[in-house]
A protein has these predicted regions:
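Electropositive polyanion-binding surfaces
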Residues: 1-233, 240-247, 276-296
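OB-fold/S1-family single-stranded nucleic acid-binding modules
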Residues: 213, 242-272
Length: 296
């Protein structure tokens, strides 16, 4: 299923005409969100992940990627956003309690109060489409289903149990993200060693935060010169510490490249959250700026 085939109106797969219609609808939804956000969402960004080929310590680490913005990827993402936004607004219209994910001034939070999500570009956003994967989605679906049946919803506005669910979920969600970022970091470092890589290209995200190109890895770089967002730099790998998950690097040079468009994406969530898990005491080589960057 390619964009070219869809635009030509020739998709020789089951339900081809339906998929073409849904793709056009998804593109319209995306355009509307981009107008609200005030900027387009970059396409073509790759989500990197690892798989192991073999067993034990001799297993080969394989780096793989999934490109965002492909037709089916776009279709699923936009349908989920559309459903979560619509159902969130539907609960608010009927004064039924729900759990919302909102973003104002760059800060993302879970709340029982309906509010816009600036990063996505929607007036409401209530996670509801993945009840088998997230407990919050199941809570919202129970609220929706009960209301549709004309029954009393399990939770009321200002329900202390609902606040407890939000608090517990926030804590667990943060712990999961922290664990995931550390695993991404560990396997990125292992892959760097396996491939014998001594130099890495990185992109400045903000301040001393950089992201390694082609790996799901980011870290703070104490002492990094002030550089514009999106600036590409070349880093030298000096040392890898798997126990503390610290990669010591030095700045080789600032490259004549910029990738600001790739950094505009917030993944519809905060991009800088994961790097905070990196130990702040990462060693710095004398006369050099350790750096790395990764990822969204």
């Amino acid at each position: 299923v390619t964009e070219e085939a869809i635009q030509e109106g020739n998709l020789p797969v089951p339900y081809g005409p339906e998929l073409i219609w849904l793709w056009k609808f998804a593109k319209k939804l995306l355009k509307g969100r981009e107008e609200v956000r005030g900027r387009p969402e970059p396409v073509g960004r790759i989500d990197w992940y690892f798989s192991l080929k073999g067993e034990d310590e001799n297993a080969e680490i394989e780096l793989k990627g999934r490109r965002r913005g492909d037709p089916l990827d776009l279709l699923v993402a936009e349908m989920m956003i559309f459903a979560n936004s619509t159902w969130g607004g539907w609960l608010e219209e009927r004064d039924v309690a729900g759990i919302y994910r909102s973003q104002r001034m760059g800060r993302v939070k879970m709340t029982s109060v309906p509010g816009p999500h600036d990063g996505i570009g929607v007036p409401y956003y209530a996670w509801s489409t993945s009840p088998l994967r997230r407990y919050v989605d199941m809570v919202n679906q129970r609220q929706i289903i009960a209301t549709l049946k004309g029954e009393k919803a399990p939770y009321r506005n200002n329900d202390s149990e609902l606040f407890s669910i939000i608090s517990t979920f926030d804590s667990n969600y943060s712990a999961f993200n922290d664990f995931q970022s550390r695993m991404d970091r560990y396997w990125s470092m292992r892959w760097i060693e396996q491939e014998g890589i001594n130099e890495l290209k990185a992109t400045v995200v903000k301040g001393d935060l950089v992201r390694i190109e082609g790996l799901p890895m980011a870290q703070r770089v104490p002492g990094l010169p002030e550089l514009p967002r999106g600036q590409s730099v070349l880093m030298k790998v000096l040392n890898l510490d798997y126990l503390s998950l610290v990669m010591e690097c030095s700045l080789i040079k600032v490259l004549n490249e910029s990738h600001e468009e790739d950094l505009e994406e917030e993944e519809i969530e905060a991009e800088v959250e994961a790097p905070e898990a990196v130990p702040p005491e990462a060693p710095q080589a004398e006369g050099a700026e350790p750096g790395n960057a990764g990822q969204a």
